[in-house]
């Protein structure tokens, strides 16, 4: 399900204008990283559970649980940001940064 969500979001981003895609690029990279690492942790926990080392399996599962509960929720914020248009980013004129 996580990989499918990432794929569907990637298809949405692919359809963006170049400006909107560029505006969300950093959030897309963070979103992708968190999602794909989540998939890897699910896979590692599953592989370890099928092995013959219960201590390793418990450690992998606990680390996977930590990732899911503490880090994976960050995807929601990055996804929300990357799906926004570049309007607020482009609304600031160059001279509006002149503070001197």
Which residue ranges define each predicted feature?
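C-terminal amphipathic alpha-helical interaction region
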Residues: 1-100
């Amino acid at each position: 399900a996580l990989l499918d969500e990432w794929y569907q979001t990637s298809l949405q981003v692919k359809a963006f204008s170049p400006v909107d895609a560029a505006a969300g690029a950093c959030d897309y990279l963070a979103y992708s990283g968190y999602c794909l690492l989540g998939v890897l942790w699910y896979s590692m926990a599953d592989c370890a559970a099928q092995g013959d080392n219960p201590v390793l399996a418990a450690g992998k599962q606990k680390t996977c649980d930590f990732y899911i509960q503490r880090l994976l929720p960050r995807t929601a914020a990055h996804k929300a940001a990357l799906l926004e248009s570049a309007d607020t980013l482009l609304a600031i004129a160059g001279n509006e940064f002149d503070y001197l």
